[in-house]
């Protein structure tokens, strides 16, 4: 288990959805389509000459080492060095990302954060994932004048119909408990 105790869950939803989107487009197999080794310099020179629209006055020499220059001075690496982070993680399809995000990550949220609901929204998160938004109590914050009101403030998520009862229970009890007890079933032993 790994907890991000500050920052809420909205950023995690964005990261998760973004990675799912990128996984389909930027996996190793698809990235091969953009591998500079696969560029046909002869064909590219022909296209520049044909469609250069006055910017190219003659057909470029595809054998000129300056003809094809990569942005930022990028060089053509060996094929063996081309890799993608998702492939290195063993992600074969976008659905595999759910198994990384859903079971092991916990996202600490403040009581008054309306974006807590994003973590529980199966319609919003790809593949129906529920990211573990958890009540990371802001009782000790300098801007909380009365610590007895924090949980009631969190309950406003139900009153505003941002969370249902089950999600609220997961938010304030189940997920914070799981964070510790899932790794150590005796974590709370002797506390009651």
Language-model features, listed with the residues they occupy:
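Active-site glycine-centered loops adjacent to acidic/histidine catalytic or metal-binding residues
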Residues: 138
